[in-house]
């Protein structure tokens, strides 16, 4: 009978890089729980597998053994399917999928629906989970990876999220720097009108202002403005930087933005 180690190493030959404790137990019904646990612990100690989630394992390809971890893109889809959770790769991590590589993310950002999940932290990786009330699946792309597929927010949703979660991504200036790289991928005219219902209107206002007044991406900015106009929302004034005093600050009438922050774009 094959050993657990050989069973594990055979899986990548079939294109599988993840497995669960239950799968091992089913494959080795005559083996005790203690023996299975010891066999898996040995493979973890050798760096051949890792466990980002209790009962869920990732097979580490040879080229990643010395690092002791693999990119989250290798296993995230399988892990979230195992948990029965909807998700998408978001914020700076999503922006990198769309070619915005100037701001290299130090953590892998994943958007989920409630209930919240604890961040997954290992010696070589950090996955940060953000919650929103509903995953707008129509605006999530299915991207192919080396080991399968992964869900990534479309460029437009990525752009809006960067401003919705500006406090989590560093600053408005950092978000604007990423938007400068994303701009050529943005076309809000291609989106259905219900997109406005899926995101905070204030984030669209901030995005439109930055595209229009800071990045001078007039055509893209107009596609945002047209989407807002078609939605029928009556825009209210909102601060450019959430949570910061806006007393006495300049007001932009078109976007209904209170300019309470000076934006500085990094050189690209």
Task: Label each residue range with its predicted role.
Residues 24, 94, 159:
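A residue-level signal for conserved active-site and pocket-lining positions in enzyme catalytic cores
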Residues 32-33, 102-104, 167-171:
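Short amphipathic alpha-helical segments with coiled-coil-like heptad repeat character
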Residues 29, 84, 99, 164-167:
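Hydrophobic/aromatic-lined pockets within catalytic cores
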Residues 51-63, 69-135:
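Short gly/ser-rich loop at a beta-strand->alpha-helix junction or flexible surface loop bordering the NTP-binding
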Residues 2-86, 183-205, 211-212:
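Short beta-edge/loop segments at beta->alpha junctions of small alpha/beta modules
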Residues 140-268:
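Hydrophobic alpha-helical interaction segments
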